[in-house]
A protein has these predicted regions:
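Electropositive polyanion-binding surfaces
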Residues: 193, 202, 207, 212-214, ...
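Non-cytosolic beta-sheet module surface loops
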Residues: 94-96, 168, 646-649, 708-710
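Charge-lined substrate channels and their catalytic hotspots, especially those that engage the 3′ end
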Residues: 10, 18-310, 317-363, 394-395, ...
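Basic Arg/Gly/Lys-rich low-complexity intrinsically disordered segments
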Residues: 1, 11, 16, 20-22, ...
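C-terminal functional regions that serve as terminal interaction/effector modules
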Residues: 695-696, 700, 708
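Internal insertion modules embedded within essential enzymes
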Residues: 143, 166, 217, 708-720
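A short macromolecule-binding patch
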Residues: 111-116, 184-191, 663-681
Length: 747
């Protein structure tokens, strides 16, 4: 049994609140249970170890219940308490894929991801905090191992959301709601909807409050709390996304009051103590429809061998103070969300689009990183300070690209842009030389008409105008992380962990099956060599997509674990405080004298990682809903459009294609390919026509048309496009499955 060590007795601090006392007691209990000489103790024994008076037993029991519900402690036989991992119980957050499989990200960052089969997920939903009993035969949970861990959900610690959007339907004897989210595995049984502001009709989109769900083998029960309207009613599609992802349409009145109280202009009192950069040639470069300008730059030639670069970032922390209504709401939202038809901002427009936005021809407050950079792109020095600027010009990326594609004019700002391009390209080459991975893919932007229908789909390419700003922001993020780490300040870092070795091995086998040389991908240099090799191959884009799927997802953490994709040991987010709460935290950590505690930052880092993923899912779904309607209209017309596509995966039932023109993927079922009967070759991972010996393999380029849209499952099936001048469907590439040499010649 653990001995009393003569520590400070845990007494109630004079004048402290109950919450503060509870937090102190929680910390003491967790510290005690983590000691190497601790043996499982019951409540009376814990009272002695913590040096608590006997009359505080009820208080201790209440704290233990809270800790147990949070997954921070576990109760075992004899009502004794231990750390959960000692009982093979792991608390963490579960993420579900659309096939129903779960993946637990343990709270303990030293533990590997845990895979949870669909049958073992219990009643967990996507992004719930859960307690998982690990499979004791699996070694993947031990620190430093690479084998995958497996487990089973034994308890829901915290529901991420209890409100679910779906379609109201009727069975023989009861009403039910089919969830829009395919990761919810069952329909939800509901009683006859009560009066919630508008009548509910079968087929309507509704919001359900989840009430009971006892077992994964039974249907959950709920209650309709809001009727959104018919699915084809204008605006209902986006309202469904807003409700499904709990995105607020409006700010609370106290938040708006604080935002409006900041005023509309920078005053002399705001400028006091700042470096005056208003005479500098400061500019912003953003998308043509942007309104929240987070960042600005200025470049100046110091000598033949040196440049001075100023990276100015909007000083949101000057206006949004810790503990205010503005700060509380910003933290709750975590980030701005960019849906296909609107922005759900993190901050009210009085700040995001006005006083904090680095608009041209007005004074604005910034946090500045000033670099001294060698001619070859190496950073020689960086310093940090609050500043005031007066932006000279606002550019769109398209305008900058047009300037960079022509010869420099006498205009000093245009000359600066040409110089910035040359310098940032050198910086970019150094970054890739250091191991940064080239994982850029063209993106798309959907433009809507006044009725919310797709007008056109535009491709966004990461050209030199984007790269110019990207390299400046990466430099600033790295420099700030370096400064924070050198000062040992509690902060939040942007981390992208090294991929799981098992996934890399599986991916390497896929590459080798395509007869492409591939070394040990646990070495970043080999990954770079492979990606460079793939850029020159027709199959390359498909395999690059496969590599992306093998990577970990970037997140926020209080530990500076580095960024694998960027090959940076020190990295954070500093450059977008208008739209990311993480950056606002980092501004405070860098410049404020009173820093937040590590425990508070850890909780915030997990929260904003969740809100970031939530926003990404909402943004994707908002685009998909518009695309589904767009493709359904094509089917109804009888003349669906033709789209270039790339085969990204081959299965025995068909092949998946990526359609860049739609920014989406889908299945081409074999049942729709009518020119032959195709057999799946497991060894070569391709499909071979039994009669013609034609081959369908990874990386093939085809032309497809939409064949089926399933809005419930959020899936689109394609078919090979019908040739304009032929009666039959397009044939797959005519390649013989047994002749590798002839295939390589055609490439």
């Amino acid at each position: 049994m653990v001995a009393d060590r003569g520590g400070t007795p845990l007494e109630r601090p004079p004048g402290s609140s109950g919450n503060a006392v509870f937090q102190i007691m929680k910390d003491k209990i967790i510290h005690l249970l983590a000691r190497k000489d601790y043996l499982p103790a019951n409540v009376p024994e814990l009272l002695r170890h913590l040096r608590l008076a006997p009359n505080r037993q009820q208080e201790l029991q209440a704290v233990l219940r809270q800790l147990e519900q949070a997954g921070a402690v576990a109760r075992i036989k004899g009502n004794r308490y231990i750390q959960p991992r000692e009982a093979d119980l792991i608390p963490g957050r579960i993420r579900m894929n659309r096939q129903g499989k779960g993946f637990l990200q343990p709270d303990d960052t030293g533990l590997k991801e845990i895979a949870i089969e669909q049958s073992a997920t219990g009643t967990a939903l996507h992004e719930d905090r859960v307690l998982v009993r690990r499979d004791v035969r699996a070694k993947g949970l031990r620190h430093g191992t690479t084998e995958p861990g497996t487990g089973e959900v034994v308890r829901i610690l915290e529901r991420r959301r209890t409100q679910i959007v779906g379609t109201l339907q009727k069975g023989r004897q009861f009403l039910y709601v089919t969830p829009d989210d395919p990761r919810v595995p069952h329909d939800i049984l509901v009683p006859e909807p009560r009066d919630v502001g508008r009548p509910a009709h079968l087929g309507d989109k509704v919001v359900v409050e989840l009430r009971e769900w006892e077992s994964r083998h039974t249907n959950p029960e709920g209650e309709v709390i809001e009727v959104l309207g018919a699915p084809d009613e204008e605006g209902v599609d986006m309202l469904s996304v807003l409700r499904q992802y709990d995105l607020p349409l409006h700010f609370p009145k106290p938040v708006l009051h604080e935002a409006n109280a900041t005023g509309t202009m920078v005053h002399a009192r705001d400028i006091a103590g700042r470096v005056d950069c208003r005479r500098h040639q400061v500019i912003t470069i953003d998308p043509d429809d942007a309104k929240d300008f987070d960042d600005a730059i200025c470049l100046e030639h110091v000598s033949a061998a040196e440049w001075r670069l100023w990276v100015h970032i909007a000083d949101v922390s000057h206006y949004v103070k810790p503990g205010t209504a503005l700060d509380t709401e910003a933290r709750k939202r975590g980030n701005s969300t960019y849906l296909v038809d609107r922005v759900i901002p993190m901050l009210p427009e009085a700040l995001s689009n006005e006083l904090c936005s680095l608009k041209p021809n007005v004074d604005r407050l910034t946090k500045c990183v000033e670099f001294l950079i060698a001619q070859d792109g190496r950073v020689l020095n960086a310093k940090f300070y609050p500043a005031v600027i007066h932006s000279q010009r606002r550019f769109s990326y398209g305008e900058v690209l047009a300037i960079l594609e022509r010869k420099p004019t006498p205009d000093p700002i245009e000359q600066m842009l040409h110089q910035a391009k040359e310098l940032t390209q050198r910086i970019r080459r150094l970054r890739f030389k250091a191991g940064s991975l080239d994982l850029d893919f063209p993106e798309t932007k959907i433009r809507l008409d006044e009725r919310g229908r797709i007008l056109r789909i535009e491709k966004t390419v990461n050209d030199v105008s984007h790269q110019l700003i990207e390299e400046c922001m990466l430099l600033a993020n790295e420099a700030v992380a370096t400064r924070l780490m050198s000062q040992a300040k509690p902060a939040v870092y942007r981390v992208h962990e090294v991929p799981d070795e098992r996934r890399l091995r599986e991916y390497r086998e896929d590459v080798l099956s395509q007869n492409i040389p591939c070394g040990n991908l646990s070495h970043p240099a080999e990954v770079q060599r492979l990606l460079h090799r793939l850029n020159a191959l027709p199959i390359g884009p498909a395999l690059k997509i496969g590599f992306l799927k093998s990577l970990m997802r970037a997140r926020y953490a209080v530990e500076p674990l580095g960024h694998y994709g960027l090959a940076k040991k020190k990295y954070t987010h500093f450059t977008s405080p208008i739209r990311r709460y993480a950056d606002l935290i980092v501004h405070r950590a860098l410049f404020d004298k009173t820093a937040a505690t590590n425990s508070a930052l850890k909780e915030t880092a997990e929260h904003i990682s969740v809100t970031e993923r939530n926003s990404a899912d909402a943004e994707r779904d908002s685009k998909d809903l518009k695309l589904f309607a767009f493709l359904k209209a094509q089917l109804a017309s009888g003349q669906p459009e033709r789209y270039p596509a790339l085969v990204t995966d081959v299965r025995n039932f068909g092949f998946f294609v990526d359609v860049p023109g739609l920014a989406m993927s889908g299945l081409v079922p074999l049942s729709t390919v009518e020119d032959d009967f195709y057999v799946f070759d497991v060894a070569r991972n391709n499909l071979v026509g039994r009669r013609t010996r034609r081959v369908i393999r990874l990386g093939d380029k085809m032309t497809v048309q939409v064949a089926k849209v399933d809005s419930f499952k959020k899936q689109v099936d394609f078919r090979l496009a019908v040739e304009p001048k032929a009666a039959g469907a397009q044939r797959p590439p005519q390649r013989q499955g047994s002749s590798r040499r002839s295939t390589q010649r055609r490439r």
